[in-house]
Design a protein with these regions (language model features):
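Acyl-donor (CoA/ACP) binding surface of acyl/acetyltransferases
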Residues: 1-19, 65, 69-179
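Short amphipathic alpha-helix that is part of the acyltransferase structural core
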Residues: 10-11, 16-36
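N-terminal cationic-hydrophobic initiation segments that often serve targeting/anchoring roles
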Residues: 24, 55-58, 120
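Conserved GNAT-fold acetyl-CoA-binding loop/helix
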Residues: 31-53
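Short, P/G- and charge-enriched loop/turn segments at secondary-structure junctions
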Residues: 53-56, 158-160
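A short helix-loop-beta-strand connector motif used in the catalytic cores of GNAT acetyltransferases and
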Residues: 54-67
Length: 179
């Protein structure tokens, strides 16, 4: 399954064994640890096991990881995740991570747009949300706002960064019904 829109510079596809190095690079990028709960590097062995056992059924495991592929080069450039999926409430949390040299070039926006289309079409999801650091993630805040997400709440002192706690902004988008 590759999901794309013909004019999009990216496509989304399932995780493959060949994605080991991409996963290794992103999961071990300590600059990303500040915006998630990971604080430990992963070995290639552990990631290889993860890839081999990664279920691709959102209904079964309530999460789905897709690889972002740059259409022009066919190279994997990032990861987009759906987590905390609630079929009853038709919602899921999203997160995205791109290779450093691909950030700020519009790939994030295009990937999230594709994810919106995919989740709405195949899973009936009507609402997506993201938790974003309010302290210093202007690029992510700007990206979600440009895609029509609203900052609906601030979770004070929600996330520990170093010795401090920072606020997290909750961005939400109610997806319009497709005809």
């Amino acid at each position: 399954m590759d999901f794309s829109i013909s004019s999009s510079p990216v496509l989304l596809r399932p995780l493959e064994p060949e994605d080991l190095e991409l996963l290794y690079t992103i999961e071990n990028d300590a600059t990303l640890w500040d915006v998630c709960d990971d604080t430990t590097p992963y070995s290639r062995y552990a990631l290889r096991q993860y890839i081999a056992n990664q279920p691709q059924d959102l209904h079964q495991c309530r999460e789905l990881r897709l690889i972002i592929v740059e259409r022009q080069t066919a190279a994997p450039i990032g990861i987009v995740d759906l987590v905390n999926y609630s079929p009853k409430n038709q919602r899921a949390e999203i997160s995205i991570a791109l290779l450093r040299h691909k950030r700020g070039k519009g790939y994030g926006e295009k990937s999230i747009f594709l994810l919106e289309e995919y989740t709405q079409r195949f899973y009936g999801i009507r609402m997506l949300y993201a938790l974003v650091s309010s302290r210093n993630n202007a690029l992510a805040n700007s990206m979600f706002k440009s895609l029509g997400y609203e900052c609906i709440a601030c979770l004070p002192q929600w996330h520990k960064r170093g010795d401090d706690f920072e606020d997290i902004d909750v961005f939400q988008k109610i997806l319009e019904k497709r005809r």
